[in-house]
Amino acid sequence: AQMGCASTLIGHCEERNDKMGILAEAGVTGQAAAQAVSRILNQEIKCAQAAGLTVLYCIGEKSEEQADWENVLGAQLDIGLDGVDKRRVVIAYEPIWSIGPGKTPADKPYITKIARFVKARTGGLDVVYGGGLKQDNAAMLASIDEIDGGLIALTRFSGEIGFYPDEYLDIIRRYLGK
């Protein structure tokens, strides 16, 4: 906050995965590790808020967790948001199973189902989509009433993978319907 930052990203799937790996080395795995990671992230959220930052809190399920998505996402929300100022939190949903080159993106009914669940579980917090908002799905994502925006890290997921400003602007235009 002292450097002019207003918000921070906490709990990105890669961050969660790194923390799970550290816990696995210590012999903690499965649900116990997932809950421990959410408790660590909860402390990160509290520290960020104490510093005056708004938090973009990422949640998501892996392919092997899809059948149990309600419990997985519910625990991430309940533990991660315990005792925090929810007025200063936005939820970023990352369907981990669908992120990356060659993966099948989550479809509109699935994303809608998850966003409704998150809003119901959190008392209506804003939900942004973090599972690959790109040119070919921006309009579809914008058409989901329960989605309040998107998280864009890369603009190109194949070939020359990376972030390209012109493509970023095109994604925004398509999301806004322009």
Describe every region a protein language model picked out.
Residues Y129-Q135, L154-T155:
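Glycine-rich beta-to-alpha transition loops that act as phosphate-gripper elements at the mouths
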Residues P95-D126, L133, I161-F163, E167:
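Glycine/Thr-rich beta-alpha phosphate-binding loop at enzyme active sites
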Residues I22-A34, R156-K178:
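C-terminal helical cap(s) of enzyme catalytic domains, especially alpha/beta-barrels
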Residues A6-S7, T54-C58, R88-A92, D126-V128, ...:
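Structural preference for beta-strand elements that scaffold enzyme active sites
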Residues M3, A51, I144-D145:
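Structural motif
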Residues G132-I147:
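Catalytic cores of alpha/beta
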Residues S7-D18, R88, P95-W97, P101-K103, ...:
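Glycine-rich phosphate-binding active-site loops on the catalytic face of alpha/beta enzymes
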Residues H12-K103:
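Conserved anion-binding
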